[in-house]
């Protein structure tokens, strides 16, 4: 919230797909609840849909469903629910998840694992992805389908963006090439952050530098709902359909 207040142009933060962290924060800073709620309501913070980010295979089906229901209910109290199922680092995703998420009103799902074939001793075989793109259609056994977004370059592929032009040029030459290699549209997803990493307060300046270096590219500090809406509007390729469990 301090960055929202003090850093001009710093406007978005995805709270890792869950709401439980809000309880911890408000136990200490209860006096800031109204301010926090206002940032969530305006879309600066994206929260939910989970109550706590889980590993689906380590919990029961009932626990997975209730985790989602409680997370949505909790997020609604603050005025906004991010309608993107989120599994950045789950070690496999259950086959019924598109069915569960769709019934809960989710519009897409983002995940980091499970779209490469797995061979003996859980070794990933070569570079043969089950989908040609980082965007795909994930289908449950009952036929339910959701747009899936694979973090093909992982969930920290846009972290620590340089502000200085020489370093930024080297950084963006590599990042744009890597993300564009898998993307089905011109909209490239770069995730600015990683585990245990502070926010990048000078992100607006870093994106300003990027815009100067690449005048034909629009760099936006955005969020999942905006990105997914843009992807859906721009899709002109038939996406691969991946059915059932995603395990790798």
What residues fall within each predicted segment?
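Catalytic-domain carbohydrate-binding cleft regions of carbohydrate-active enzymes
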Residues: 1-248
């Amino acid at each position: 919230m301090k960055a929202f207040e003090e850093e001009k142009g710093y406007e978005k933060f995805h709270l890792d797909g869950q709401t439980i962290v809000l309880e911890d924060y408000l136990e200490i800073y209860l006096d800031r609840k109204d301010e926090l709620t206002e940032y969530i309501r305006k879309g600066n913070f994206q929260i939910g849909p989970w109550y706590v980010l889980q590993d689906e295979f380590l919990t029961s089906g009932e626990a997975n469903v209730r985790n989602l229901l409680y997370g949505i209910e909790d997020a609604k109290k603050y005025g906004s629910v991010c309608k993107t199922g989120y599994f950045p680092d789950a070690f496999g995703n259950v086959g019924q998840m598109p069915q569960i998420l769709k019934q809960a009103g989710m519009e897409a799902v983002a995940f980091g694992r499970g779209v490469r074939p797995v061979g003996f001793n859980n070794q990933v075989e070569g570079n043969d992805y089950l989908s040609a793109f980082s965007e795909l259609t994930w289908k449950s056994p009952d036929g339910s389908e959701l747009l899936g977004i694979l973090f093909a370059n992982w969930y920290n592929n846009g972290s620590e963006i340089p502000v200085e032009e020489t370093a930024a040029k080297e950084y963006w030459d590599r990042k744009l090439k890597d993300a564009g290699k898998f993307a089905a549209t011109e909209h490239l997803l770069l995730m600015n952050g990683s585990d245990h990493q502070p926010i990048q307060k000078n992100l607006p300046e870093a994106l300003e530098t990027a815009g100067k270096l690449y005048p034909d590219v629009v760099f936006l500090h955005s969020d999942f709902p905006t990105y997914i809406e843009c992807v859906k509007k721009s899709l002109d390729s038939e996406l691969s359909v991946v059915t059932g469990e995603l395990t790798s």
